[in-house]
């Protein structure tokens, strides 16, 4: 790659770093997982972080398995992922 191409790449990476919100860099990786109801049928209200809308949303959790993007309260979701 030519020095001009490397300079362009460096400039684009720098611009991307500047434009990426700090909060999304510090957010735990599991906050970007889709909500997962799991295979059980307990059907309890839970909350997950939606990275597209940058907010916590309600969903019905089956009560077992699923993933870590699963919170008992909206406040817990906000403290963990939306702060």
Swiss-Prot record:
Keyword Ligase: no
Signal peptide (from-to): 1-24
GO molecular function: serine-type endopeptidase inhibitor activity
SMART domains noted in UniProt: KU
Organism of derivation: Notechis scutatus scutatus (Mainland tiger snake)
Site description Reactive bond for chymotrypsin, residues in chain: 41-42
Entries under InterPro entries matching the protein: Kunitz_BPTI (IPR002223), Kunitz_BPTI_sf (IPR036880), Prtase_inh_Kunz-CS (IPR020901), TFPI/VKTCI-like (IPR050098)
Protein name: Kunitz-type serine protease inhibitor tigerin-3
């Amino acid at each position: 790659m030519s020095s001009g191409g490397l300079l362009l790449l460096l400039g684009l990476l720098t611009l991307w770093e500047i434009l990426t919100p700090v909060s999304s860099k510090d957010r735990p990786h599991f906050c970007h997982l889709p909500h997962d109801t799991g295979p059980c049928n307990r059907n309890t209200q839970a909350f997950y972080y939606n990275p597209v809308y940058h907010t916590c949303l309600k969903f019905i959790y089956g009560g077992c398995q699923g993933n870590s993007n699963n919170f008992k309260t909206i406040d817990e979701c906000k403290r963990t992922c939306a702060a």
